[in-house]
Amino acid sequence: MAISRNGTRINFREPTQRRRGWGGRLANLLLGLVALWLFGLLAFMTAIPEPSPKTDTTTPTDAIIVLTGGADRLAEGFRLLDQGMAKRLLISGVAPGVTLEQLIDRLGDQKGTVPNAAELACCVTLGYAAESTAGNATESAQWLQRNGATSVRLVTANYHMLRSLLEFRRTLPGIAVVPNPVFPTEVRDPYWFLKPHTVLLIVNEYHKYLFALGRALPGELQRWSSWWPASKG
């Protein structure tokens, strides 16, 4: 750098030097974003429910909601209903045309542990409208309102529970939600992180959770902003 006679500063740095400066900043930014992504992923993995004696398995609720996606979820929902944990069960996200009998047939070895379709027909509703977790929450909210329910036991896979709770608590603010995670075979293995398929499953779920969190954030900010002036007064 030099100063001309009139006092104006003139930058004699080469263009390549300036480009290197911007390149370094960009590299630092990318490294920071990667570090933030990894930190978030580790936090997400740590928050995924694990089998624990502290899990609430005894509180009865007005209804049970099972999110489709695996035989373990269905079997758990039917078992809870049979044990009297609730009087009604909604299976949300059923493919169009699929019947209760067909869902029971998909239980495989677990089929013998649940009542037959005729016994379940009185208390089980199949929801065909939902195509996503957000859709599950919307479909469930409408069904719960029709049935006058104020509490629900939510059954889904443990790795899916964080996003499900986020969507349900955002969509059903007046409903008490009791999480009831099930543990699919692929995540029961203590060395699941060595299996590419399971790692991809968790990473994809992490990305979906971030997207759901981004969708929920404006509503949370609005709620906080409406609460803040009142709390100050």
For every predicted segment, state its role.
Residues 2-26, 109, 121-124, 143-144, ...:
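Membrane-proximal intrinsically disordered regions of secretory-pathway and membrane-system proteins
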Residues 2-5, 49-196:
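A structural signal for short, hydrophobic/glycine-enriched beta-strand patches
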Residues 12-55:
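N-terminal type II signal-anchor transmembrane helix
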Residues 27, 72, 204-207:
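Residue-level micro-sites within transmembrane alpha helices that shape
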Residues 44, 159, 168, 206-209:
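Aromatic side chains
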Residues 61, 219-233:
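Short linear elements at protein peripheries
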Residues 195-225:
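A transmembrane-helix-recognition feature enriched in membrane-embedded lipid enzymes
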